[in-house]
């Protein structure tokens, strides 16, 4: 596999720093690095410095936070994007965007290959490779960690031997964070029976240390998307940042589950995602207020889980994803209103909701007053409603 110009998706971590030197040696190629900012808590000036010290010909920093929020996270909110009903798809959403930005740089430079630091056991290799194949099928894809066969200890030794600037040799956890979530893997997390140590968490306080008084938030939605919190209009990215802060301060947003990876095995995954958890529950509740029972069942049990599966499995480019979103958009144009949530010591409750399009009628729901069907109407309804079941039951005796 020949390549003279390689554009590497660069995080600044051990794998991709070693990859800069390895790619240069292996292929005799010029290596360019790209770091895409999707809201991760990194020192980007240090990452750039590290890239050049590792041998990059040129480093590119791309601020994609707004695009990530408005083109990726927004879709996840509309589609209640939770893989297996639990994981808010933070990493899965970011990888196609990062891959697309790497392809853009590769095109600008006239490169003949792109590279990434994913291993052969991870989901991210699929997400990256499939996106590149869709956008630029002519570009070669190189995944050094799938080729070189080095253990982590051997990577550290390689880095030391070549004088590479790596300062994370003894990390306890593997962390991946962005605007939408923070994932925590490795070390004690790999024991599915052990409670995650408190030092694994950064965005959320332990529920027992959260404030003794609850926090109430009123979230306003327009056509399925949040547009204001407590009456203050703001951008989606700002709303997410605010909810991450407020939710985390109340211990809301910790996720611990066994995940079915697309590469064929189960893994124990721990996440922090306060904003994602709050918006998921608030949005679904508003949908229940507005949508008809048939719309609700179709969206919550067909559209939403299918969409989450596609995104998790690296199929952002799958035509079905777009079709699912188009179907949902027809319903979401009515999902406007306000939802009031209560945050308290790690728990979240929706405690109020209203919408000009809500299907709820107090007159119909109130048992103490209002309209009642007549006895004759009730009997006729019950007779027709139960006919299928009762007919089958009688025939099967």
UniProtKB/Swiss-Prot annotation:
Pfam families: Arginosuc_syn_C, Arginosuc_synth. GO terms for biological process: argininosuccinate metabolic process; L-arginine biosynthetic process; urea cycle. InterPro entries: Arginosuc_syn_C (IPR048268), Arginosuc_syn_N (IPR048267), Arginosuc_synth (IPR001518), Arginosuc_synth_CS (IPR018223), Arginosuc_synth_type_1_subfam (IPR023434), AS_cat/multimer_dom_body (IPR024074), Rossmann-like_a/b/a_fold (IPR014729). GO terms for cellular component: cytoplasm. Its main location: cytoplasm. It is found in: Cytoplasm. One of its GO terms (molecular function) is argininosuccinate synthase activity. Pathway: Amino-acid biosynthesis; L-arginine biosynthesis; L-arginine from L-ornithine and carbamoyl phosphate: step 2/3. SUPFAM superfamilies: Adenine nucleotide alpha hydrolases-like (SSF52402), Argininosuccinate synthetase, C-terminal domain (SSF69864). Keywords: Amino-acid biosynthesis, Arginine biosynthesis, ATP-binding, Cytoplasm, Ligase, Nucleotide-binding. It catalyses: L-citrulline + L-aspartate + ATP = 2-(N(omega)-L-arginino)succinate + AMP + diphosphate + H(+). L-citrulline binds at residues 87, 123, 127, 174, 183, 259, 271. ATP binds at residues 9-17, 117. L-aspartate binds at residues 119, 123-124. Its EC number is 6.3.4.5. Belongs to the argininosuccinate synthase family. Type 1 subfamily. Homotetramer. This is Argininosuccinate synthase. It comes from Pyrobaculum aerophilum (strain ATCC 51768 / DSM 7523 / JCM 9630 / CIP 104966 / NBRC 100827 / IM2).
